[in-house]
Structure formats: C-alpha cells, structure tokens
C-alpha cells in the first residue's frame, strides 16, 4: 500500500476505502462480548408492566451490560420485581449476583411513560439509588431509557461514566449507494443523515454531538460538509481548489482542521465552523494530513511523511509558526490515523506491521506503544467518550466490518455483527448533552 493510497489523499481513494459489501441494508449490532477476564455479576429483574411494551427496557439494559464486557448477567427469573419491593439480599447473593436492579414502567395521563428503577449492592446490602425517567412508548424512547439505566449502573458500580447512551456514525455502501448513518451505541435505530451515489468518507462528530462533519464526492471532487443533525441542514465549509479532506473539530467546536491540496502537496489548514477564516497551519514540502486536536485544544496531531515515511507528529494548534512539529511515534516505520483519548493520555493509530495494518495504542507520557489487535487490515480508530474502548474498521472473512477493543488491550477485539453491505469509517460520538 503506497503512501498516496493510505494517507495522502483519502478522498481520492474513497472507493477503495468503502468498496466491499453486499446488497442488503445493514443493521449494526454491537457485540462487545467476552471483554475482560473479570466480570461483575448483576441480576436485572423484569420491570413491572413492561411485558406489553413494544420494546422491553430490561432487555436493552442487559444487552448493554453484556456488550461492555465488564458485567455478566445473572438470571433473575421471569417474575417482574418493582423498585418498591423489599429486597432479600441473601437470596440474590445466593444466585451469584453482586448487584440487583428492580423497576417498573407506568403510563402517565399525558400518554408518556414513567420508568423507575433502583440499583442494589447485594454484598453491602444497600441501595445505590436510581432514577425516574420519562419516555415515549416507542422503540426509540424505550431503548434510549434502557441505555440511560445501563449508564447509571456502569458508573455506580465501576466508577466510570458509561457510553451506552451515545451514538455512532459510519458509512454504509450498498451497491452504488452510500449512506452516512447515525445509530445508537448498540447499532440500533440507525438513521441515514445522507444518501448519495458518490462516496462519503471521514465523518467526525462535533463536541456537542449535534453536528457531523464529513467529506462527500457529490460535486465530483472531495468537499467538506457539516451536517446539523437536529435540523437536517447541511452546508459546505471547505470547497477549495484540489482535495478537501480529513475534517477534525477543535474541542470548543468553533474550528475545524482540514487537509487541503490547495497549493499542491496536501497540507493542514484551519477553518471556522461556518466556513470562514481559512488559515494554513503546516508549511512543508511533504504530505501533511489526518489532523486531530488534543482534548485540551493545545495541540494538533497529524500524519506526515516529512521524515521519509508516514509518522505521527504533534504541533501547536496555532500551527507550525507557533512551534516546530515534533514526531510522536517511533514504533515501526509507517504510522497513520492518529486519535487521542478523551483524557489526553493515549494515542490510537494504525501501524504497518509485517505487511499488514494493526491498531496500536501509545501512552503519550511514557511513549510505550502496543498493538491491541492481531489483524492485518485495521483502519479508522475512534475512542469511546469515556476512553474505555476503541471502535475501528477491519477486514473479516473477506468483508469490511466494525470492531471494538478495550483501549488498554486487556482483551481481544470483538467484531460488531453487520448484516450485509460494507461498513466503514466509524466515529464514536461524544457523551449526550
């Protein structure tokens, strides 16, 4: 794979990046199962009154907890248990559950539904609190409520904010039709933000989670757009001469870094989120591309072949005029696609190793880097909002799929179950506001 193909102008090779796939519409079911050798045993009883609902809340909760790989679901039986019931801690502990969830769903006079639940620690024999959530009686509303409950459980028991109530974006190709899809974190409720007969690549979430920047070829060249999800409105932010690619948001959402071939070689520029104030940030005779802001907004990580082969560098967010770019990756001779974890401590990237491309994670303080996959065609890493997982694209069984892996490499990657179509270019959205 040449430098031009892998890195220089991703826009020119979109057809290669999202070429494979079948004809069926894809529904992604995120299956992060078996992650981690130690799992927290928890029993989630059926909620009272949920049996007649179009979507049972507890099935979403159990599915989320299982997919996280951090929990094992203990059979709670089929009898619903309300949050108001007295809890026999010893009985649940005897079943092997260190935590227990009880709840109910009740219809309000206005047609909405109130979902109440309480989480219990069966070891300490105490309540860990709960929530009272209002939702609509439809699949989307009940699933979102289930994700919120799972997030509460994850944070209370593990001390880390959950990412179940977040969203994914990815590109699906079905035949000659491309779709930019927005889905729940488990792949359900997928909605097309854009459908096109031309390639779509490089979706990137805004920090607010309300916008997605991406590259579309609908004007017969790569152009950067922003799509406002609540309104459905979209607009061009970069349609300069040559290629416009690799958009990346600043942490405040006011600026995007983009890669443009405006003067010949691809260089990195910044532009406001309204498409004004274009400013060049790199000035090299090499290819500089794939920018990504550090979470504190002080740095931009990017890929460049200025040293003879593609490596990841870091420069001040104001550009090289404010300080020389410094090389960051030294493991291997070919490293691309930088992504920094939300806490700024880790760098995920793709490294060419043994003729293949693997997902690596580097500790930015120590410089230690390790492969967290054993596959050979990994691409497009994206951290979860809590930094616990990395979503990425890979090849499996001759087709393109998505996969997730713990960012600490504590367990093997798990393929996300995809039915039909080619799924590429994943991006994990931020925490919901």
Curated annotation (Swiss-Prot):
UniProt KW Cell cycle keyword = yes
| Role summary | Part of the Tol-Pal system, which plays a role in outer membrane invagination during cell division and is important for maintaining outer membrane integrity.
Subunit structure of this chain's protein: The Tol-Pal system is composed of five core proteins: the inner membrane proteins TolA, TolQ and TolR, the periplasmic protein TolB and the outer membrane protein Pal. They form a network linking the inner and outer membranes and the peptidoglycan layer.
* This protein's encoding gene: tolB
What keywords are assigned to this protein?
Cell cycle, Cell division, Periplasm, Signal
UniProt-listed InterPro entries = 6-blade_b-propeller_TolB-like (IPR011042), PD40 (IPR011659), Tol-Pal_TolB (IPR014167), TolB_N (IPR007195)
Q: What's the domain of life for this entry?
A: Bacteria
Q: Which residues form the signal peptide?
A: 1-26
Q: Is Cell cycle set as a keyword in this record?
A: yes
Family, according to the entry, reads as follows:
Belongs to the TolB family.
Give compartment(s). Periplasm
**One Gene Ontology CC term in the entry:** periplasmic space
Give an example GO biological process: cell division
Report the protein name in the record: Tol-Pal system protein TolB
């Amino acid at each position: 794979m040449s430098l031009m193909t892998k890195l220089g102008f991703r826009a020119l090779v979109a057809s290669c990046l999202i070429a494979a796939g079948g004809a069926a519409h894809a529904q992604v079911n995120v299956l992060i199962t078996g992650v981690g050798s130690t799992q927290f045993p928890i029993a989630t009883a059926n909620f009272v009154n949920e049996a007649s609902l179009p979507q049972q809340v507890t099935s979403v909760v159990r599915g989320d907890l299982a997919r996280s790989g951090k929990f094992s679901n203990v059979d709670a039986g089929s009898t619903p248990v309300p949050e108001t019931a007295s809890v026999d801690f010893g009985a649940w502990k005897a079943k092997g559950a260190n935590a227990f969830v009880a709840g109910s769903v009740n219809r309000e006079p206005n047609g909405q539904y109130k979902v109440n639940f309480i989480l219990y620690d069966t070891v300490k024999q105490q309540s860990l609190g709960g929530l009272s959530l209002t939702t609509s009686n439809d699949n989307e509303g009940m699933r979102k409520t289930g994700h919120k409950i799972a997030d509460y459980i994850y944070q209370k028991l593990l001390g880390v904010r959950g990412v179940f109530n977040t969203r994914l974006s990815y590109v699906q190709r079905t035949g000659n039709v491309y779709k930019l899809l927005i889905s729940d974190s488990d792949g359900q409720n997928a909605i097309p933000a854009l459908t096109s007969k031309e390639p779509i690549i490089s979706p990137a979430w805004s920090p607010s989670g309300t916008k997605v920047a991406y590259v579309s070829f609908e004007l017969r060249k790569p152009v950067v757009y922003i799509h406002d999800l609540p309104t459905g409105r979209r607009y061009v932010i970069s349609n300069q001469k040559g290629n416009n690619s690799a958009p990346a948001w600043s942490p405040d959402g006011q600026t995007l870094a983009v890669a443009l071939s405006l003067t010949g070689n691809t260089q990195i520029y910044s532009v406001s989120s309204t498409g004004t104030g274009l400013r060049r940030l790199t000035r090299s005779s090499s290819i500089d591309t794939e920018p990504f802001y550090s979470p504190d907004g002080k740095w931009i990580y990017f890929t460049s072949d200025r040293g003879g082969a593609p490596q990841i560098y870091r420069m001040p967010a104001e550009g090289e005029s404010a300080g020389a770019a410094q090389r960051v990756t030294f493991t291997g001779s070919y490293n691309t696609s930088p992504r920094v974890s939300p806490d700024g401590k880790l760098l995920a990237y793709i490294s060419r190793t043994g003729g293949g491309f693997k997902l690596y994670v580097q500790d930015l303080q120590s410089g230690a880097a390790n492969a967290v996959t054993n596959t050979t065609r990994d691409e497009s890493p994206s951290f979860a909002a809590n930094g616990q997982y990395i979503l990425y694209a890979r090849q499996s069984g001759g087709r393109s799929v998505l996969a997730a892996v713990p960012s600490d490499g504590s367990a093997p990657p798990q393929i996300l179950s995809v039915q039909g179509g080619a799924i590429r270019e994943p991006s994990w959205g931020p925490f919901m506001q």
